[in-house]
């Protein structure tokens, strides 16, 4: 008998769920009752067990009896109203969330182990984060293991501390929680006086009750950053400040230290968005390297020097590099012996140390790597013998790898980026043919969809996603106007999700269209994208160029001299200013002028 062809009805599952949902109103189709706050809701056991591992476990450990009695499932901590909303979600996949109910829905989804619903709640909470609630959302997310939401709320708190410190939520913090907040190294304040003033406002909010905590709270202040003349001025005008300074012996009123003593005690708040380069090979010897460096284009325009960071545990080339949730991840690639690797490492910028990661399912190099909400997606590449179309995903919190649907085609040295929680695969080649095609992968549906192709086919390009935009830089292709194998650098392109088409960027000040140019990475920081590579300008080589998205123009970025390394991995990483300052001091990158007495 012939095997035939598999056919499917895309509406089958939706129709079936609608029919099952209609049965909820008919007692003859319900075989159990949920009991909440003394009220009973008729349900269908098999549907509920299929949706909730928690309910399934209760049924397994306490199976229904054959005596004809109605099976009852008691649930505590969930209101009847919220449970009805969740039952509607189970049958429809839709739920209405708002700021009044989100906490109750998260608690219920957590109890019932409804992972998909919890994910929807996380996305809703991400859009709610503001100065007025970020501390509360941060604590709530930590309690319910909403890791990505906790990271975003912490990042918001660090970035917008001055706004947060003026809110009612901040003024109502407990002494212990206040100490935790003002101890954060990356508070973006510019001057410690703003942290000091925030603590003063907190104490003044309930002076009588909080005086007893005054000394303990002030111990978390970074007093080395307070100016003594500012403190004396505040003492003249504010009786509460006089009392605090008198009570707290750690607050300085003497003249500030000078020279080496000042540098030794100085501890700047805040953070810098750094360009980080990792691995690659030495330019002259072509020997793979484990070196890691960072440069802070927005930290100090007059001192944009490369700072040495802790090296990898082993040299890597053709590896994948990505920053996610405040850490840096390096995966795969090849070692000094050209052996393709499955291993990976995670860098902690607070400790300046590396730790090993669980290995990938497949060793690979020249692959794509993107991140969505704390999940690292590894796409394609090569294993030394063959070109790969496999994809796997690493959860950075559970530290586990899972296989994902394959790519639809080989994209040798293609480029990849994430935008609006979707993955885009662009260009690349196979068996001597280059592609301009672009595909989009939605992790929710686990489906690939073709979108508008690039204007130029290319391989060896780099890409990044920013908000609703995709950018593709560099890559090469063969010249079409001559016979032979001469290669040219492709023009950069831009795609907006609203317009659904690619547009050329003006690359006049990036590099000339010669095969001698090669792009290693594109790093979005603030309103700019920094492109790193061997950029042939026609008169010399640049290593980093800044693309300002608002004007569509290219600009020089120090250092202008070419690096001693090439083919490095690149990423953006937020690093505490106090950590950078110590590293710069240790590496002799600061020059201070000490005035003679």
UniProtKB/Swiss-Prot annotation:
Keywords: Cytoplasm, Cytoskeleton, Kelch repeat, Neurodegeneration, Repeat, Ubl conjugation, Ubl conjugation pathway. Pathway: Protein modification; protein ubiquitination. It is found in: Cytoplasm; Cytoplasm, Cytoskeleton. Residues 134-236 form the BACK domain. GO terms for biological process: cytoskeleton organization; protein ubiquitination. One of its GO terms (cellular component) is cytoskeleton. The keyword Iron does not apply. Residues 30-99 form the BTB domain. SUPFAM superfamilies: Kelch motif, POZ domain. Ubiquitinated by E3 ubiquitin ligase complex formed by CUL3 and RBX1 and probably targeted for proteasome-independent degradation. InterPro entries: BACK, BTB-kelch_protein, BTB/POZ_dom, Kelch-typ_b-propeller, Kelch_1, KLHL16_BACK, KLHL16_BTB_POZ, SKP1/BTB/POZ_sf. Interacts with TBCB. Interacts with CUL3. Part of a complex that contains CUL3, RBX1 and GAN. Interacts (via BTB domain) with UBA1. Interacts (via Kelch domains) with MAP1B (via C-terminus) and MAP1S (via C-terminus). Probable cytoskeletal component that directly or indirectly plays an important role in neurofilament architecture. May act as a substrate-specific adapter of an E3 ubiquitin-protein ligase complex which mediates the ubiquitination and subsequent proteasomal degradation of target proteins. Controls degradation of TBCB. Controls degradation of MAP1B and MAP1S, and is critical for neuronal maintenance and survival. This is Gigaxonin. The lineage of its organism: Eukaryota, Metazoa, Chordata, Craniata, Vertebrata. The gene is Gan.
């Amino acid at each position: 008998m012939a095997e035939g062809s598999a056919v499917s009805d895309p509406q089958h599952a939706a129709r079936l769920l609608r029919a099952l949902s209609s049965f909820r109103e008919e007692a003859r189709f319900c075989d159990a009752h949920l009991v909440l706050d003394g009220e009973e809701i008729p349900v269908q056991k098999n549907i509920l067990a299929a949706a909730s591992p928690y309910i399934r476990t209760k049924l397994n450990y306490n199976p229904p009896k054959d005596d004809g009695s109605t099976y009852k499932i008691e649930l505590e901590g969930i209101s009847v109203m919220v449970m009805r909303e969740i039952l509607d979600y189970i049958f429809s996949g839709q739920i209405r969330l708002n700021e009044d109910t989100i906490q109750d829905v998260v608690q219920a989804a957590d109890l019932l182990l409804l992972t998909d619903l919890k994910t929807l709640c996380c996305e809703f909470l991400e859009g709610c984060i503001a100065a007025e609630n970020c501390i509360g959302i941060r604590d709530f997310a930590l309690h319910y293991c909403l890791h990505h939401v906790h990271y975003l709320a912490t990042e918001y708190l660090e970035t917008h501390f001055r706004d947060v410190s003026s809110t009612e939520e901040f003024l109502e913090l407990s002494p212990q929680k206040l100490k935790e907040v003002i101890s954060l190294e990356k508070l973006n304040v510019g001057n410690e006086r703003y942290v000091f003033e925030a603590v003063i406002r907190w104490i003044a909010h309930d002076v009588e009750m909080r005086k007893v905590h005054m000394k303990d709270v002030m111990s978390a202040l970074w007093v080395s950053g307070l100016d003594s003349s500012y403190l004396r001025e505040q003492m003249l005008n504010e009786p509460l400040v006089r009392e605090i300074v008198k009570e707290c012996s750690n607050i300085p009123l003497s003249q500030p230290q000078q020279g080496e003593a000042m540098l030794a005690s100085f501890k700047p708040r805040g953070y810098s968005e750094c360009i980080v380069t990792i691995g690659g090979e030495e330019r002259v010897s072509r020997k793979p390297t484990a070196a890691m460096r960072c440069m802070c284009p927005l930290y100090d325009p007059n001192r944009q020097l490369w700072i040495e960071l802790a090296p990898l545990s082993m040299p890597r080339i053709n590896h994948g590099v990505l920053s996610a949730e405040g850490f840096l991840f390096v995966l795969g690639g090849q070692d000094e012996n050209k052996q393709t690797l499955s291993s990976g490492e995670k860098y902690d910028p607070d400790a300046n140390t590396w730790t090993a990661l669980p290995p990938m399912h497949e060793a690979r190099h020249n692959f794509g790597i993107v991140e969505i909400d704390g999940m690292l997606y590894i796409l394609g590449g090569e294993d030394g013998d063959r070109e790969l179309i496999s994809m796997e995903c690493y959860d950075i919190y559970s530290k586990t790898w899972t296989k994902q649907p394959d790519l639809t085609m080989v994209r040798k040295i293609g480029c990849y980026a994430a935008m609006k929680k979707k993955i885009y695969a662009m260009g690349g080649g196979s068996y001597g043919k280059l592609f301009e095609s672009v595909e989009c992968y939605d992790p929710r549906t686990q489906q690939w969809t073709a979108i508008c192709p690039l204007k130029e086919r290319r391989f060896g390009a780099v890409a990044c996603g920013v908000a609703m935009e995709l950018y593709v830089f560099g890559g090469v292709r063969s010249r079409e106007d001559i016979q032979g194998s001469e290669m040219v650098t492709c023009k950069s392109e831009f795609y907006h999700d609203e317009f659904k088409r690619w547009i050329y960027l003006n690359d006049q000040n990036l590099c000339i269209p010669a095969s001698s140019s090669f792009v290693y990475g594109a790093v979005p920081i603030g309103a700019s994208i920094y492109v790193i590579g061997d950029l042939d300008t026609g008169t010399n080589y640049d290593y980093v160029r800044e693309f300002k998205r608002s004007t569509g123009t290219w600009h020089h970025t120090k250092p202008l001299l070419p690096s001693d390394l090439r083919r490095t991995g690149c990423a953006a990483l937020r690093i505490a200013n106090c950590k950078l300052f110590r590293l710069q001091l240790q590496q002799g990158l600061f020059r201070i002028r000490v005035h003679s007495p």
